[in-house]
Each structure stands twice: as C-alpha cells, then as structure tokens.
From Swiss-Prot:
GO cellular component, one term: mitochondrion
Recorded coiled-coil stretches: none
Lineage: Eukaryota, Metazoa, Chordata, Craniata, Vertebrata
Entries under Gene3D superfamilies matching the protein: 2.170.220.10, HUPs, Isoleucyl-tRNA Synthetase, Domain 1
Protein name: Methionine--tRNA ligase, mitochondrial
GO molecular function: ATP binding; methionine-tRNA ligase activity
Amino acid sequence: MLRTSVLRLLGRTGASRLSLLEDFGPRYYSSGSLSAGDDACDVRAYFTTPIFYVNAAPHIGHLYSALLADALCRHRRLRGPSTAATRFSTGTDEHGLKIQQAAATAGLAPTELCDRVSEQFQQLFQEAGISCTDFIRTTEARHRVAVQHFWGVLKSRGLLYKGVYEGWYCASDECFLPEAKVTQQPGPSGDSFPVSLESGHPVSWTKEENYIFRLSQFRKPLQRWLRGNPQAITPEPFHHVVLQWLDEELPDLSVSRRSSHLHWGIPVPGDDSQTIYVWLDALVNYLTVIGYPNAEFKSWWPATSHIIGKDILKFHAIYWPAFLLGAGMSPPQRICVHSHWTVCGQKMSKSLGNVVDPRTCLNRYTVDGFRYFLLRQGVPNWDCDYYDEKVVKLLNSELADALGGLLNRCTAKRINPSETYPAFCTTCFPSEPGLVGPSVRAQAEDYALVSAVATLPKQVADHYDNFRIYKALEAVSSCVRQTNGFVQRHAPWKLNWESPVDAPWLGTVLHVALECLRVFGTLLQPVTPSLADKLLSRLGVSASERSLGELYFLPRFYGHPCPFEGRRLGPETGLLFPRLDQSRTWLVKAHRT
C-alpha cells in the first residue's frame, strides 16, 4: 500500500523529470481559486486590502490585513512567470467626518493630518516587506474622477433620488443604523445614551435632505449572487452571516451628507450642497487603482480578491456588490474575511493602553519573524490573541530550532566537508519500499517523509486557495519536524565519509534533507521572503529555480538527473534565524491565572 501511495504521489516511471507542478499544478486549482482562477499562469489576479482610515496610527490588525494580501499575492506570483498579471493594492481612506473632527481636535488642516498618517502606513508597509503594486489615497485627483463618474453612472440608471433621511448615524463608524441596531447604554452618572449594537460607539439622531441609493432593490440579486457562488465570501461562516442579513428587508441607503455638516470629502457632481458618503467614496478605490473609468479597468475586474476585517463585512458584502450591480458591473470574485487581534484577551484600545505598535514588533522580532508569527497564528474564523511570550516561543521553536537547526546540521563542514549537494544513492534508498539487500538503508518512515514532502506544494496551494495560510504554514512546520526526525534517526554525524559502506548512505541522507529544505524554502517565500532567500541561497538555488514550476522534488529517487547534485552550496552567512532572548522586558505579558 505504501509503495503504491509513494509512486502515485511522487511521479511516474518513464518521466524525463519529476515535476510537482505537472502532477499537482494549476490544473488542480479550482476555478474560484484566490491565486490563479484558471489554468493559465498569466490569467490576471487582483488582490486588495481595505484602505485604512487615517484617524489613528497603524496597529497590528492593519498589518495583518496587509500581510494576508501580500502572502496571497506572492504565492500567486510563484505559480507563473508573469508578475505583470498580478496586482496588489492597499492605501488610505482620507475623507469623512471622523477625519474632519480629528484634524480640528489636533489643530491641523485635514490635508496635513492625512499626509502625516498616510505616511505612517506607507513606512510600515515598506518596512514589513509588503509588495503592493499600488498605494491609493482617496484624496488623489484620479480617485475623485473615478468616484464622480461612478456616481454619475448610478444616477443615470435611476438608482439615486433626493429625499429626507431621518435616523441614527454613527460618526465613529461612518454609517447609518436602523432602530433595531441601536441600544441604550448606561452612562457614568446614571443616565443612558444610544450606541451601536455592532460596535458600541455612540450614535446621534440625524434628519437631513440627502441623496439616497435604492438599496432595497438589490436584496434578491444579492441573495442570488451569494447562493450561486458559495465561495464568494470566505470563510464560510461569514458567507452564512451575510445571507442571514439578507433574510431581512434592505432599507434604502443615504449616500450623501450636507456639505455644511461634512465638507471634507468629494462633492456630489452638480450639487455642491452635498458631499458623497465616505463609504461609497472609499469602496470605489478598488476601481480607481485599475484605471476606472477608462476601459483598461475591465481587464482586471472582477478577478479580484478583497481581504477585509470582519468589522467592515456589511460594507463589502452588501453595499459594495449592490453599488456594482447598480452600475452594471459584476461583484468581486472573492471577499476574504478575517477576524481581529486581541491583546491578552482584550480588544485593543487607546483607553486601555494596550495598542501594540507593529513597527516595534518588526524591530524586536525581525521582519520575517513577525510576518511568520501573524500569518502562522492568525486564524481568519475567530479572534486571535497576542502577547510577547507567544511570539518568542513560536519563533524560537519553528524558525530558530526546527528549520534553522536542520539547515545548520545538513550544511555544517563537519558533516558535509565538501560543501556540496551530495549524490543520492538509489541502492541505499530504492524507489520500491520493502526491498531487502545489503545496501538498502531506507526505512518505512523515510518513505512516509518523501510522500509528505512530495505532496506538500499541492497541499499548501490548496490552503492558499481557501484562505487558510495558517494551515499552509502548519503543514510546512509538520514536514520540517518529520525531516528533523529523519536526520535524527539516521544520525549522519555518526557516519564516515571514508567508509565505502557509510559514504553512499551519508550522502543520501544529506541529499534528501537538502531536497526537503529546498521545498520548504520555496514554499516559505510568500511569508518570510528574506529568510527563504537566505535558506535557498545557502543551498545554491538560483533565482530562476525558485518558482513552483521549478520545484522538482527528489528526481534521483527514480534515477533521473538532479540539477543540484554535486553543486557547491552557497556561502555560509550565519544562523538562519537567531534565537530570541526571552529575558528581555515584554511589550505585552500574558495574564497569569
């Protein structure tokens, strides 16, 4: 049974080369995949983060959104030769009442506040290695053109009318709320005040003449879209939540405010007395980036994956698709939703003083280390908790000890004095398990390792396609542990290169371990790009050999040539990931019970 499994997973005899991309490549990716969408490598893919509000400095939740999109985009680039077929946008949302009020409180002009905070986001993303192709600011002239054109399309299709809106408005969330979404909260002096049930932020009663979007017309079209596209919103629980929202009637939506009340925004075309609602303004950024309203945007839309936090799900899963349908356009291909980061079980809050500065974390834990932590520990389905001890424990265990230790052991001069990729001996490790002979040294567990690593790229790709990057890293970590077990089991440091009996098996053990490391390094590129580069460079893997299309694993297992066999390793550059010092003062300690 094991032999059949290994042969099926590792390739077919008679093949000129063992190609994992051939056996487990794009033809296995679903048509709704995040990374490809079709079999062709040059099919366009467009990844977006939310544009981040500039009323406060960036925190780790913002960085997490950007890292999810970055890893998805980087993995997509590994799958094909054309990086021009991939776009990745992020940016800042700079209009609205909150910005207007925050600037006034700080004694700044709104433009000055926006410039200052937008620069903080740009610096953070540059330091964190976010590989965005576009950084959009909603104060840019190109965006104003796009928003006003989009408004004109909605108006020309009879979807905007002027009327008196009367109801609850939450300035903090920049949204209107029905009565059912408002509750009374006790105040410190015993009186009560109205707040949003969803966010807990205060709301106020508003009555004014606005432009109103006929959202009520789109309830059934939205239901048909979601029921016909079960992967449109992922993970599945969020898809279910949106369908539950759509069980209720959708009220028409106010999409402007009086300019006398809100002047910091984009004016309604032909009516300077009104300012376009900040969420309609903000959502159009996804079109601005790809050239809307020029025809070029059609080559990118709707091949889009929006990565968003769960707090803005309604805006992206109901309002935005309704706006698009109203404008005669398709909804986005995929909306990927993630939950929040808490700190020691509590929501991050300025008042609690527990907001974690991501730039401090990048400096303390290294860029690759903190990227790995957030993507390894972050689970989109539910909130994840942050504290420093968890970061140190994970990075020391998985990057410093398991992965770094494996690389050091297999490339150390004492074990590999020639500093080359040793030869693989097919008589020591035959492709048929269970063979008996004086030269056969491979054990059943060794075939299980080969099988696990051979299927790893396909498994990782499936996890990326299903927005489970944490599962992809879990799978890589599991194979790293298996490979360490393989090396420990055969103890190459006890074998002698001078012995005609030991030497072929010693070379084979190192060859298999280095091949496993090459797979790990290739698959870690989207998450830890610098660390992966260091690992692959140490193995002597050139830049042109690092895509999934070049990931031929263990071809000598079938006696086919291996391009790395006999190749000199790259230069020694120190530890792959130095262990973190646990004696340092924690930024955030875990609560002790």
